[in-house]
Swiss-Prot record:
GO terms for cellular component: cytoplasm. The active site is at 52 (proton acceptor). Belongs to the NAD kinase family. Keywords: ATP-binding, Cytoplasm, Kinase, NAD, NADP, Nucleotide-binding, Transferase. This is NAD kinase 1. The lineage of its organism: Bacteria, Bacillati, Bacillota, Bacilli, Bacillales. PANTHER family: NAD KINASE (PTHR20275:SF0). The keyword NAD applies. It comes from Geobacillus kaustophilus (strain HTA426). The gene is nadK1. NAD(+) binds at residues 52-53, 129-130, 155, 157, 192.
């Protein structure tokens, strides 16, 4: 449970549309009336007002202090898998934040490390949903190593490496499995792999536990389009891309029960 004698410090991120901005401003006013403190630099709680894209933005803005910051979402967008609240519940949420100790739920993250042929400094990223790897042009050809052993040579459009919470995003559209976020794992899913008499891939999603590392090694020296959640990055002279379950975790503030499978049902099946 999160609550100390010191006033809770909060920040709000908004989708930027009129409805979200008005809701965010109203929440800020109400919470300040409860003597909570607003600080965009070092918040205890970040309130995301919008859709899943807004929460992804908030996550990357505060990914340097994940051990100190928890997130809660208010859904005003098209898809709100990460959001527990809707605008009609604004006053109920404000009172809960101001008066109720909240439970912190931690979910696994994906760590992506990109190393370069020139031996320069490596680039390291954290993903809440997924990392995708594609060639800028042509077919992606990658050697896939698991725990240091060559597993396959992949040929196709690309690869998607997702977290358990991210398994409901792009990974699901690719036919990957939905993983419960209590599982410390990542999932590797193919995008339109080439399979014929000459070339073979496993053709199935791979679920790797926390102590397994997936290493992608380019066969050809080409440029890569690599996405980390909503961020799209062009990388040249790539030697390898290492993917593993991160040591860090994302923390969500829960003011009421919202079981994962109910969240999945509400997002994809329920009317």
């Amino acid at each position: 449970m999160k609550r100390t004698d010191a006033p809770l410090v909060f920040a709000i991120t908004s989708k930027g549309d009129d409805i979200s901005n008005a809701l965010a401003q109203k929440m800020k006013t109400y919470l300040l009336d409860f003597d909570l403190r607003y600080d965009e630099e070092e918040p205890d709680l970040v309130i995301s007002v919008g859709g899943d894209g807004t929460l992804l933005y908030a996550f990357h803005r505060y990914c340097h202090r994940l051990d100190k910051t928890a997130f809660v979402g208010v859904h005003t967008g098209h898809l709100g898998f990460y959001a527990d609240w809707v605008p009609e519940e604004l006053e109920k949420l404000v009172i809960a934040i101001a008066k109720t100790p909240y439970q912190v739920v931690e979910y696994p993250l994906l760590e992506v490390t990109i190393r370069y042929l020139n031996g320069g400094s490596e680039a390291k990223y954290l993903a809440l949903n997924e990392c995708t790897v594609k060639c800028v042009s042509g077919t992606l050809v990658m050697d896939v190593e698991i725990r240091g052993d060559l597993f396959e040579r992949f040929r196709g459009d690309g690869l998607c490496i997702s977290t358990p919470t991210g398994s409901t995003a792009y990974n699901k559209a690719l036919g990957g499995a939905i993983l419960h976020p209590s599982l410390e794992a990542i999932q590797v899913t193919e995008m339109a792999s080439i399979n014929n008499r000459v070339f073979r891939t496993i053709g199935s999603p791979l679920v790797l536990p926390a102590h397994h590392t997936c290493l992608l090694k380019p066969v050809n020296h080409v440029d890569f389009q690599i996405t980390i959640d909503h961020l799209s990055l062009l990388h040249k002279e790539v030697k390898s891309i290492q993917c593993r379950v991160a040591d860090e975790k994302v923390r969500f503030a829960r003011f009421r029960p919202f079981p994962f499978w109910r969240r999945v049902r509400d997002s994809f099946i329920a009317d």
